[in-house]
Amino acid sequence: MLHELKIYPMHFNDILKNNKNFEVRKDDRLYEVGDYLYLREYLPADEYTGKEILAKVLYVYRGELCLQDHCIMAIEVLDWWTVQSESKKIGVATDMGCF
């Protein structure tokens, strides 16, 4: 399943630079291993920047260490070639802005 999500620039850049390989999110979308996160950089002034990342969910933790109704997902950012080969299967345009 593909999940389109807003993400603030600080977190977006940390993921893009491989400094962050997880996402903490409200667990309202039934995230599962193998899902894809379509992360779109978003400014608080209600606008998208055009920068996007596609990441695959590798692990989902739901437990006592999480905030109530939240989960922690281990993610892997997909490279350009993988996005190209997976895009038709998951329904993502291949002109994503950060590859």
PLM feature spans:
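Short, charged beta-turn/beta-strand-edge "cap" motif at the junction between a beta-strand
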Residues: 42-47
